[in-house]
Amino acid sequence: FIAYVGIFLEKNSTTKQSLIDLENIPFVTVAHITTGKFNIFCKVRARDTKHAKDIIFMIDDIQGVLRTETMISLEESINDKKRLMHRIFNEL
């Protein structure tokens, strides 16, 4: 399944290294630097809830991470990549 993890950092200056460390976790598939509540917002793919917990603990272990907040995706309702690809192929 898919989960989204908002990451709170101790300091903004740790953002670059935190992203490097996130890149070393293969189950983190997307990461964004964001404004607002979180410093970094990422997408995680997990096999099950235990696997998701393990991934979240890996993220929590990154130096500079203060805490995380996780949201589990119940359903993908809109996927612009899929719509865009269908449109491109239909125009060919």
Would you name each region that the model predicts?
Residues F1-L92:
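A compositional/biophysical signature of low hydrophobicity enriched in polar/charged and small residues
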